[in-house]
């Protein structure tokens, strides 16, 4: 007997249940994932005043959505992962594109820290990148999580495309 894949809005993934868990019921995504990135941005922005934060920045590693929740204290982490897998593929792909850009920007900052003999030389530059480049990417990722995505940005294809767009903006 084959089990049906979980569907947003039904059963364990009912809108009420997702809302109670702080998971967007329309997208199946949770903003808690962004805490991982907000943490490193905070450290990057503190570098000019607290150069000792450089070690913590270098210790930061990218985590995908599922790995973040598996290692988090989020009370409904299993539900968050289940909802993520039920989220529209094109929406997840759009989120992952933003996450990849965030990870690349943080990696560049980490490389700059590793390759400078004195962190104070690059601390302000790195803090500016965090504020002016990484934070806007996190805001864009938040928009995806909340379903605030231009339909043309996710480039849906096939006969289910309109249904996915309609569900996203319902």
Predicted region positions:
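Short, low-complexity N-terminal regulatory "tails/caps" that precede and couple sensory modules
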Residues: 1-9
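Short acidic DE-rich linear segments
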Residues: 3, 155-170
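Signal-transmission coiled-coils
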Residues: 9-162
